[in-house]
A protein has these predicted regions:
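Active-site loop-to-helix "anion-binding N-cap" substructures in soluble metabolic enzymes
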Residues: 1-440
Length: 440
């Protein structure tokens, strides 16, 4: 990686603004439902604290302003509390990993937990060194930052409560920059957005470096894209071909050895071949594109593998009509919702002997049981291939959820925190949040 990282600079005693990605699902009870992104940022947070920095954490959560506008237009209630990072703050305070973190050479241990709670269990009650700001800019926040001591952490409130964040507004970026001496981007999941906290802020903070998670993401994805160990197999799923065209074309151009396509996007390919797809999701405007993709794959010597069977339901009786049939025998009243057992076996065999695997996107309607079976089967196949020597990279919400649901997270080489960012990077696009960082 040709970007400077937090390890390349001296941060002791400095105010370090770390852009993290804490855009995590929060349940109605206020508990974090998936802490993957939070845990991904912990090495950088811990490193900064141990080096004696005054740590400022900033993140977005959802799209509060857009959702507020929609609620007002529909005359619906708007709950501002669901967009607060307060729940993340409570979660951070109780993390065992952030206990007993001491600054280098200090006499007193710096501790980041003080009360029990959250889904991770109980944390020992100790001195509280993690704080929460009720805002992300302004005089009150400035005062809180000035009170920070070395090794202490301040989590700012949701950046997207201000329109200037998504607009990459210079004034908002300047206000964020005034809080710090050093900028660290550790939010790979937001690196494809040119927002005030991912790009604009670097106009005002000249020291702008990558965090440890950002470094890890870029190293894994760069190797997969530019110098993969072969055979190289990519698995793509999800609803729409249109969302994946750039990454498909990039993978074919780089001559991925095998390209496995599942999920609803497969039906656009089936219809382009003349198959009847019933009421399955199809992008009719993408039919010619699907044909062109198949031609390009063939010309490049890329083995493009589509499902051979799928789980379907009758659109008129979805609760009682599930069955598995060959894809070419789909009549007009059926809806395809997952890959079948035969396809799962074919995909598993396609991964045998692979040395590099990239997977993004579910194989079916993962959020509805039993149509998560195909995605879980692929997760198991990827984990098995990893145990047999493959480097595996999994990105995208449903793909990562499948890995976690199956208890396979420890068996995957790298679980990417990026969804759209991962896809754009694999498409060969330079991400704004990465481009803004200092070169080595």
């Amino acid at each position: 990686m040709n970007k400077q990282t937090i390890r390349d600079i001296d941060i002791r005693g400095k105010r370090v603004f770390i852009r993290v990605d804490f855009n995590v699902p929060i349940g109605k009870d206020g508990r974090i439902e998936d802490d993957t992104r939070i845990r991904g940022a912990l090495p950088t947070i811990r490193y900064a604290a141990e080096q004696g920095a005054k740590v400022i954490l900033a993140s977005h959560l959802g799209r509060p302003l857009k959702d507020k506008k929609k609620a007002e237009e529909k005359g619906m209630p708007y709950d501002a509390n669901k967009y607060s990072l307060k729940a993340v703050y409570e979660y951070l305070r109780a993390l065992p990993e952030l206990q007993d973190v001491s600054t280098s050479g200090g006499d007193e241990p710096v501790v980041y937990a003080n009360e029990q709670g959250t889904a991770l269990g109980k944390a020992e009650i100790k001195n509280d060194k993690v704080f929460f700001a009720g805002d992300c800019v302004g005089d009150v926040v400035k005062a809180q930052v000035e009170k920070l001591r070395e090794g202490e952490v301040l989590l700012l409130e949701n950046l997207r409560l201000y329109a200037g964040e998504e607009k990459n507004d210079d004034e908002f970026a300047r206000q964020l920059a005034e809080l710090a001496d050093v900028y660290v981007n550790d939010a790979f999941g937001a690196a494809h957005r040119a927002h005030a906290s991912t790009a604009g802020i670097t106009k005002f903070l000249t020291t702008a470096v990558a965090g440890l998670l950002m470094e890890k993401e870029l190293n894994f994805l760069s190797k997969a894209l530019n110098n993969p160990e072969r055979p190289f197999v990519a698995i793509l799923g999800g609803a729409k071909v249109s969302d994946k065209i750039p990454v498909i074309e990039s993978l074919i151009a780089r001559k991925v050895d095998k390209l496995l396509i599942g999920g609803a996007m497969a039906y656009t390919f089936f219809k382009s071949k003349g198959y009847t797809v019933g009421k399955s999701l199809v992008e009719n405007e993408m039919l010619e594109t699907a044909q062109e993709i198949e031609r390009k794959a063939q010309d490049a010597g890329v083995e493009l593998i589509l499902p051979t069977d799928h789980q379907v339901v009758d659109s008129y009786d979805p609760l009682n009509s599930r069955k598995t049939i060959p894809v070419e025998f789909t009549n007009q009243g059926l809806v395809g919702l997952d890959i079948g057992i035969e396809t799962a076996a074919i995909f598993r065999r396609a991964l045998e002997g692979a040395k590099t695997i990239v997977w993004n996107g579910p194989m079916g309607m993962f959020e509805e049981k039993p149509f998560d079976e195909g995605t879980i089967a692929v997760a198991q196949a990827v984990a098995e291939a990893t145990e047999n020597g493959a480097t595996s990279i999994v990105g995208g919400g449903d793909s990562v959820a499948a890995i976690n649901q199956a208890g396979l997270d420890e068996k995957i080489t790298h679980i990417s925190t990026g969804g759209g960012a991962t896809l754009e990077f694999l498409s060969g696009v330079e991400l704004p949040g990465v481009a803004a960082l200092n070169e080595k």
